[in-house]
Amino acid sequence: MEVLRRSSVFAAEIMDAFDRSPTDKELVAQAKALGREYVHARLLRAGLSWSAPERAAPVPGRLAEVCAVLLRLGDELEMIRPSVYRNVARQLHISLQSEPVVTDAFLAVAGHIFSAGITWGKVVSLYAVAAGLAVDCVRQAQPAMVHALVDCLGEFVRKTLATWLRRRGGWTDVLKCVVSTDPGLRSHWLVAALCSFGRFLKAAFFVLLPER
């Protein structure tokens, strides 16, 4: 019950930021909440489970809308380049036994993704990469690594994306990337942008990382 109460309070604090200009701290908290939901959805799709106390309370209102859009755009991206987001650890030639190895690899790919600027397409790719790694971790009996990945995602957002997000009014700006004509959500111009971006991301995966 205490975990549920704290989760409800935490969710309320996150949602409060959607009603005004969010601070960097709030943007990071929202990024991590979205990361947990995105990863959880991808794990469920893979027939896997993961325990996260922060998920005890349902994702509220606008945050749920943002998450739904990220997941839908992620679906589109994965259809365009399915091999890029599967078996991520194997593509990066890394072991999942060491947290520094996993987080360093994620940050290396994230750095390449955003080396030429920031777009919503690249943000979706960031979440897809994190989820792909999370699936690998759980499959290899390393569920604790998922928490580390979510924290790492939040730190990357703080250092690299927070200013960009704040200028756009926060995470809800991604809702402009789709035209919602029905519950299925029809993708807008972002999908075309994701298609051209796929080749760049594919190349990023094959950058040699330092040997461990």
UniProtKB/Swiss-Prot annotation:
Q: Which organism is it from?
A: Homo sapiens
What does the record list as GO biological process?
apoptotic process; cellular component disassembly involved in execution phase of apoptosis; extrinsic apoptotic signaling pathway in absence of ligand; intrinsic apoptotic signaling pathway by p53 class mediator; intrinsic apoptotic signaling pathway in response to DNA damage; male gonad development; negative regulation of mitochondrial depolarization; negative regulation of mitochondrial outer membrane permeabilization involved in apoptotic signaling pathway
- Per the Swiss-Prot or TrEMBL annotation, the motif BH2 is positioned at 164-178
| PANTHER family listed in its UniProt record | BCL-2 RELATED, BCL-2-RELATED OVARIAN KILLER PROTEIN
What's the domain remark here?
A: BH4 domain mediates interaction with ITPR1.
* Position of sequence motif BH4: 32-44
Q: Where is this motif: BH3?
A: 66-82
Superkingdom, taxonomy of origin: Eukaryota
> Per UniProt, which keywords does this protein have?
Apoptosis, Cytoplasm, Endoplasmic reticulum, Endosome, Golgi apparatus, Isopeptide bond, Membrane, Mitochondrion, Mitochondrion inner membrane, Mitochondrion outer membrane, Nucleus, Phosphoprotein, Transmembrane, Transmembrane helix, Ubl conjugation
Task: Write out the PTM section of this UniProt entry.
Answer: Ubiquitinated by AMFR/gp78 E3 ubiquitin ligase complex; mediates degradation by ubiquitin-proteasome pathway in a VCP/p97-dependent manner; prevents from pro-apoptotic activity; promotes degradation of newly synthesized proteins that are not ITPR1 associated.
Checking Gene3D superfamilies in the record gives:
Blc2-like
Q: Residue ranges for motif BH1?
A: 112-131
Any one annotated GO CC term: mitochondrial inner membrane
Q: Would you identify the family this protein belongs to, as annotated?
A: Belongs to the Bcl-2 family.
For the cross-link Glycyl lysine isopeptide (Lys-Gly) (interchain with G-Cter in ubiquitin), the position is 25, 32, 159, 176
Q: Where is this region: Nuclear export signal?
A: 70-78
**SMART domains from the entry?**
BCL (SM00337)
Report which gene this protein is encoded by. Answer: BOK
One GO molecular function term of this record is: protein-containing complex binding
Name the UniProt record assigns to this protein: Bcl-2-related ovarian killer protein
What does UniProt note about where in the body, tissue by tissue, this protein is expressed?
Expressed mainly in oocytes; weak expression in granulosa cells of the developing follicles. In adult human ovaries, expressed in granulosa cells at all follicular stages, but expression in primordial/primary follicles granulosa cell is stronger than in secondary and antral follicles.
**Chain intervals for the UniProt region annotation (Interactions with ITPR1):** 15-45
Which conditions up-regulate this protein? Up-regulated by DNA damage.
The record's note on quaternary structure and interaction partners says: Monomer; positively regulates apoptotic process. Homodimer. Heterodimer. Oligomer; promoted by apoptotic stimuli and BH3-only proteins; mediates constitutive activation. Interacts (via BH4 domain) with ITPR1; enhances BOK expression and stabilization; limits apoptosis and prevents ubiquitination and then degradation; protects ITPR1 from proteolysis by CASP3 during apoptosis. Interacts with ITPR2 and ITPR3; binds most strongly to ITPR2, and barely to ITPR3; regulates their expression. Interacts with XPO1; translocates to the cytoplasm. Interacts with BNIP3; promotes oligomerization.
Report TM segments: 189-209
